[in-house]
A protein has these predicted regions:
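Thiol/disulfide oxidoreductase modules built on the thioredoxin-like
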Residues: 56-63
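Local sequence-structure signature of Cys/Sec-based thiol-disulfide redox active-site neighborhoods
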Residues: 1-33
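C-terminal cap of thioredoxin/glutaredoxin-like
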Residues: 72-83
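Thiol-based oxidoreductase modules, predominantly thioredoxin-like and allied folds used
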Residues: 28-50
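A short, hydrophobic beta-strand/beta-hairpin element that forms part of a small beta-sheet core
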Residues: 63-74
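Major-groove DNA-recognition helix of helix-turn-helix-type DNA-binding domains
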Residues: 52-54
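Short glycine-/acidic-enriched loop or helix-start segments at secondary-structure transitions
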Residues: 15-16, 40, 77-79
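Short, glycine/charged-enriched secondary-structure capping and boundary segments
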Residues: 18-21, 45, 81-82
Length: 83
């Protein structure tokens, strides 16, 4: 399984997700929004255009960690990735 994780090394939920994905031997590409302005800019474009984020934005959340699956699907649910 290959997955891109979009998050921050400062976010406990992101760290938990990275650990769980490592446990199942997933191939992880980590986009650390706290360390890369280009990754942050790309994430904000995704967040502004993807309907998955409407509830997150309305509640004032950031929406991380986010996961981009091999087929390009985006989910905010680690359970979807681990299936």
């Amino acid at each position: 399984m290959k997955v891109t994780v979009i998050g921050s090394h400062l976010c406990p939920d992101t760290l938990y997700a990275l650990n769980r994905l490592s446990e199942v031997k997933a191939e992880i590409e980590f986009k650390n929004l706290s360390a890369s302005l280009p990754d942050l800019k790309a994430y904000l474009a995704l967040r502004d255009s993807d309907p998955h984020y409407e509830a997150v934005k309305q509640s004032g959340g950031i929406g991380i960690p986010a996961f981009v699956l091999e087929d390009g699907a985006v989910t905010l649910d680690l359970g979807d990735v681990l299936k």
